[in-house]
Every structure is written in C-alpha cells, then in structure tokens.
Amino acid sequence: DDILIIGVVMNNKGSVLILLVIVIALVIVLGLSVLNSAVNYYAIKKFNTDSKESFYMAETGLNEAYVMTCDLINESIEESLQMADDYLLVNPHSQAEAENIFVVNYMIHIRANIGDRIKTGENPFIEIRNEDLIFVDDILSVMLKASYMHENNVSKVTGAEFVISVPGYNEVSSGTYDVRNYIKLQNWNS
C-alpha cells in the first residue's frame, strides 16, 4: 500500500485527490484561454465592423458633397444665364459679350460658394484640402477629404478630387444640359 519515493513514504489515498485537482486546474486554464480567444476574436470582429462602417460613412460624406456640388453648379448656371440674358435684353447684338458674362459669373459664383456648400463641421467631416480655388483653362479642381469618427473612436479618412468645368453658353441657354456633365470625380482614395 505504501510507496517509497526518495526516502519518503507516500500513501496512495491522497494521490487521486491531487491528480483530480491538477486535472480540474488544467481544464479551468484551458477554458479561460478559449474564453480569452473568443473575446479577442469578438473585439477584432467588432473593430473591423466599426472600421468598415466608418469608411462607408466617410464615403457617404463625399457622395453628399457631390450632390451639393451638383446643386451649386445648377444654381450657378441659372444665375449666370439670367445675368447673360438680362445683358442681351439691353444689348441684343452682343452675343459674344453675353457668353463672356455667363462664363465669368459662373466661375465667380462657384468659387464664392463652394466652400460653404461642401465643408461640414459634423460627422462625416468634409473639408477642402486645396487653398486656392482657381479656374485654370475653365477647370476648377477641388481636393476633398472626408473623415468619419465612429462612436467607438474608430476613424476613417477618404478623399477625392472634384473636377468642375465651365459649361458652354449655347448648351445651357437651350436648356438641355445635365449638371453631371460638368463635374467629374477623380483620384478617389482611402
């Protein structure tokens, strides 16, 4: 019944209890490690979900900026066309000058209002990255940055370039124009 180990006499009756305690401890450690892995997996999955949501919300901000820019282009066309038509009522033989008035007023109206129309101070946050908004060869390039901060402090940033062109006076004066022809999206990035 008794076992002699290194000069110490042991009784077999307590060894089963010690073995049972060791097995239970190993099962608990294994269970805790599986639980820890599951919690970490959930945290990573939640972060990925929040990250994707933040990215899509930032893209939504750019889409909203696109719609606001289309509205601004349409408004600029209408106001500039009205100014050119008013000029033609007074000077009916100055078609070239009316076209020039249309183009100049269109560019002025776009440059004066695009910052207020696009920039937002809310989530998603939209900002214009280039400081100088100048038409070059009847093209205005507007660099936009959109960021979204998720409630779990997950932030994503994306950007795009809006290229706004000046429409032809004859095309818009006939009333058959599509605003989307005067804005292009380029350099979409994340």
Listing of model-derived features with the role each one plays in the protein:
Residues 1-13:
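N-terminal leader/signal peptides at the extreme start of proteins
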